[in-house]
Amino acid sequence: MEKRYQQLFKGKRIDFPLATGAASHVSLTYDEKKNPYLLCWTYIYQEKPEFTVPLKGCRIINNITEIGPCIHIITSNEEYQFQCRSKEEFDEMSQFFNMLGYPILGFKNVYVLNKKIGKGSFSTAYIGTNILYGNRVVVKEVDKSKVKESNVYTEIEVLRKVMHKYIIKLISAYEQEGFVYLVLEYLKGGELFEYLNNNGPYTEQVAKKAMKRVLIALEALHSNGVVHRDLKMENLMLENPNDPSSLKIIDFGLASFLNSPSMNMRCGSPGYVAPEILKCASYGTKVDIFSLGVILFNILCGYPPFRGNNVKEIFKKNMRCHISFNTKHWINKSESVKEIILWMCCKNPDDRCTALQALGHQWFLPKLTDMHMTANINELKRNEAIVHKSNDQQDMCKKCKHFNNTQNDDIYNNNNNNNQLDPNKNHKNNYNDYKNYFDTMLKIDDKYSENLIKDKTSMDSISLNKKDYDAYLVHSNEHDTVVLHGKCQTTKNSSSLLSYKCSRRSPPQN
């Protein structure tokens, strides 16, 4: 039987898929200068290749994924990772590239280990340097004899499946000389635990930004069926040493997919573990929310909610789930942050919020004060403006509709009221009033304004009323958009939240 490399040298197509799934077959060809190219096909009988990979001047590296060994080709413009399904297939393809004059590089041909920074039960962590480019990385070294216990292949799978800006990036993974190496991005800011020890508690505003990042990352993990299971201060790192809110989630050594048998395992760190894990009950993604609630408590006051003289005492308090705010550290903290901590740390997981529900809590909604609102409310007088769906800020203002004698809590979407606010016609003053009003709201947070312009955000219809009006700008964390929300006082004792996307469930009390 012909070897795979023999088939390639005869111009035949062989199955050699890209790890991304963008191509399934390759063949070999040469240009007029005899430079070799790989032609990449999505299926074997395709007439024209999807794309070509120039091999002249490339580097070829031996990587691994959770499936097995792979061949990583780095050209001057792109990188391509081809998946091998067995060691025999990898050996054959390695021979092919060697015969072409492109030997396979291993981990030690690409990286050098500089400094040991940590050691766990199954792995050792180093700061390393990429020899080819000079950039710093973090390398996690796992002895192959401990691969099963270390969960390293699940860690690789999780980091490849859920690539997110608030989760540490897996650059590559290798097998060489009895070890598995994970090459990860280097985060300059250090551990959250160290930062808190050196600098003291966070302000509530900084904590809010930090928690939003982590919740967004957790939502990405949970929506992909992944549970971290060991969220703690040491497993959050600062991306930027000058920005304490720039947190990223690291260390997926205990992570699991929801449908995995490993979800029966009892795991976590004392003081951070959800009570359902301690009770040996079934559990899901909400164990991460509990752990993050503990972290939020900790970064605001400088000490954990479940303290004890020994591990047994900590676990006992951890199981009981009683959280107290009766110290001087909590005197000036808002009621809403205490409320969200209690919601995140509910003993019963059915009463505990999800990541998405937490992001919708009022603590994350920046509120306009009377100082921001008074002038514009007076300008609006008896008039109300309606924001209708549009593609960007300019277009949105042009499509703004104007009404008289409307009810405070109505959302208008009917076709009977269609007087356009045209800045060049009779409604010029109303148009300018509204535009100034909206500009004022955008100034609450520069990030929201930037996202609106950059992302050409569409807006939900909403009534803007002068009477007892609270306005909010909310960052929609799923899609990086901006959503405008308003609350109108309809009677003395009630109000209506005028938005399709911001109905909020009141968290239960423990």
Curated annotation (Swiss-Prot):
<keyword id="KW-0418">Kinase</keyword>
<dbReference type="InterPro" id="IPR050205">
    <property type="entry name" value="CDPK_Ser/Thr_kinases"/>
</dbReference>
<keyword id="KW-0723">Serine/threonine-protein kinase</keyword>
<dbReference type="InterPro" id="IPR017441">
    <property type="entry name" value="Protein_kinase_ATP_BS"/>
</dbReference>
<feature type="region of interest" description="Disordered">
    <location>
        <begin position="408"/>
        <end position="428"/>
    </location>
</feature>
<feature type="active site" description="Proton acceptor">
    <location>
        <position position="230"/>
    </location>
</feature>
<dbReference type="GO" id="GO:0004674">
    <property type="term" value="F:protein serine/threonine kinase activity"/>
</dbReference>
<dbReference type="GO" id="GO:0005524">
    <property type="term" value="F:ATP binding"/>
</dbReference>
<dbReference type="GO" id="GO:0106310">
    <property type="term" value="F:protein serine kinase activity"/>
</dbReference>
<dbReference type="InterPro" id="IPR008271">
    <property type="entry name" value="Ser/Thr_kinase_AS"/>
</dbReference>
<feature type="binding site">
    <location>
        <begin position="117"/>
        <end position="125"/>
    </location>
    <ligand>
        <name>ATP</name>
    </ligand>
</feature>
<keyword id="KW-0472">Membrane</keyword>
<dbReference type="GO" id="GO:0016020">
    <property type="term" value="C:membrane"/>
</dbReference>
<comment type="similarity">
    <text>Belongs to the protein kinase superfamily. Ser/Thr protein kinase family.</text>
</comment>
<dbReference type="InterPro" id="IPR011009">
    <property type="entry name" value="Kinase-like_dom_sf"/>
</dbReference>
<keyword id="KW-0547">Nucleotide-binding</keyword>
<keyword id="KW-0067">ATP-binding</keyword>
<feature type="domain" description="Protein kinase">
    <location>
        <begin position="111"/>
        <end position="364"/>
    </location>
</feature>
<keyword id="KW-0808">Transferase</keyword>
<feature type="binding site">
    <location>
        <position position="140"/>
    </location>
    <ligand>
        <name>ATP</name>
    </ligand>
</feature>
<protein>
    <recommendedName>
        <fullName>Probable serine/threonine-protein kinase 2</fullName>
        <ecNumber>2.7.11.1</ecNumber>
    </recommendedName>
</protein>
<dbReference type="InterPro" id="IPR000719">
    <property type="entry name" value="Prot_kinase_dom"/>
</dbReference>
<dbReference type="Pfam" id="PF00069">
    <property type="entry name" value="Pkinase"/>
</dbReference>
